[in-house]
Swiss-Prot record:
Belongs to the TRAFAC class translation factor GTPase superfamily. Classic translation factor GTPase family. EF-Tu/EF-1A subfamily. This is Elongation factor Tu 2. The gene is tuf2. GO terms for cellular component: cytoplasm. GTP hydrolase that promotes the GTP-dependent binding of aminoacyl-tRNA to the A-site of ribosomes during protein biosynthesis. Residues 168-170 are annotated as: G5. Keywords: Cytoplasm, Elongation factor, GTP-binding, Hydrolase, Magnesium, Metal-binding, Nucleotide-binding, Protein biosynthesis. It comes from the Bacteria. It is an enzyme of class 3 (hydrolase). Mg(2+) binds at residue 26. It catalyses: GTP + H2O = GDP + phosphate + H(+). Residues 10-201 form the tr-type G domain. NCBIfam families: EF-Tu, PRK00049.1, PRK12735.1, PRK12736.1, small_GTP.
Length: 390
């Protein structure tokens, strides 16, 4: 039996904005909160000081809003190529993505990379918002829409049926009553409600939460945050902290979401979990919290991987056995060594191959876990664990 989680009395969906730098992701996020949530201004979403100076978003901002039908938690993912690493963490928390594409420029390199990443980290649905329509012309917008649909199909999304909304996030933010203003946000919310199915949550599976961040709250102890991937957790539940170092046991002494205390946390929700007697330095991002005995840490596995072509932003040259890139698994990056299987001398950009990987540190994993392969600040491949070796 699969259960749909409710939040605030409505079905709950995790969404987020993806797309090229300066195409309007953060402006759109602000506009949605203005009309459907508690308004969060552009510069609040774009918070950290060093980010605003460069006019690009590095951190992942969390906001919430609701339609008549649903409650949405929304992450504004970084758009700049240098911050794809962070985006992988953001995208991992999305049931659906709002792909923002400028109607003036059309799809750009990061548009492609974000679509690829969305596919790879298991984002189920994409809804497109063609932005800056007020300063583009209808012919250009038609071309942009065609190009975006083709691109989505190329990366495995149903390009022909993906909803496309045309508007201006800035006009919507300025409360403009025209077609491209607030009405485009209404239309976008309608499309999200109608097109994106509320994902069946794995609440009946054993509890698992990949740790994204760790805080120390004076007088209360250590809190870890992240999105519950499977199962549910209640106060008093025993849990294990797995990966990177020896497995530790602890107990959950509190669950909270958006600063509200919950009786329990269930799959799909972004929560903070208070841990009994655990020191801040004993836990780190990249580990997971799980029901005792349900998942184990491993260093060696077999995987099916796709290595990006040069045109997709991948490597320009082949790689050979013992190549050592970074593997992004859930919320962390770990260096690993690649072993090619018999009869394979080298792997060319564009190849789809079976490989064996040996990580430098153990990570909690099971079959079916997806990951990205990165080097020198860029994605060079994607893969899925096909078999655990040890």
């Amino acid at each position: 039996m699969v259960q749909v989680v409710e939040a605030f009395g409505k079905p709950h969906v995790n969404v987020g904005t993806i797309g090229h730098v300066d195409h309007g992701k953060t402006t759109l996020t602000a506009a949605i909160t203005k009309h459907y949530g508690n308004f969060v201004a552009y510069d609040q979403i774009d918070k950290a000081p060093e980010e605003r100076k460069r006019g690009i978003t590095i951190a992942t901002a969390h906001v919430e809003y609701q339609t008549e039908k649903r409650h949405y938690a929304h992450v504004d993912c970084p758009g700049h190529a240098d911050y794809v690493k962070n985006m992988i963490v953001g995208a991992a928390q999305m049931d659906a993505a709002i792909l923002v594409v400028s109607g003036v420029d059309g799809p750009m390199p990061q548009t492609r990379e974000h679509i690829l990443l969305a596919k790879q980290v298991g984002v189920g649905y994409i809804v497109v918002y063609i932005n800056k329509a007020d300063v583009s012309d209808p012919d250009m917008i038609g071309l942009v829409e065609m190009e975006v649909r083709e691109l989505l199909s190329k990366y495995g999304f149903p390009g022909d049926e993906v909803p496309v909304v045309i508007g201006s996030a800035l006009k919507a933010l300025e409360d403009d009553d025209g077609e491209y203003g607030k009405k485009s946000i209404d239309k976008l919310m309608e499309r999200l409600d109608d097109y994106v199915e509320v994902p069946p949550r794995s609440v009946d599976l054993p509890f698992l939460l990949p740790i994204e961040d760790v805080f120390s709250i004076s007088g209360r102890g250590t809190v870890v945050t992240g999105r519950i991937e499977k199962g549910e957790i209640k106060i008093g539940d025993e849990i294990e902290i797995i990966g990177l170092k020896a497995t530790q046991k602890t107990t959950c002494t509190g669950v909270e979401m958006f600063k509200k205390l919950l009786e329990k946390g269930s799959a799909g929700l972004n929560v903070g979990i208070l841990l009994r007697g655990t020191k801040r330095e004993e836990v780190e991002r990249g580990q997971v919290l799980a029901k005792p005995g349900t998942i184990t840490p491993h260093r060696k596995f077999k995987a099916e991987v796709y290595i990006l072509k040069k045109e997709e932003g991948g490597r320009h040259t082949p790689f050979f056995a013992n190549y050592q890139p970074q593997f992004y698994l859930r919320t962390t990056d770990v260096t690993g060594s690649i072993k090619l299987l018999e009869g394979k001398e080298m792997v060319m950009p564009g190849d789809n191959v079976s490989i064996e990987v040996e990580l430098q540190v153990p990570i909690a994993m099971d079959k079916g876990l997806r990951f990205a392969i990165r080097e020198g600040g860029r994605t060079v491949g994607s893969g899925v664990v096909s078999e655990i070796l040890e």
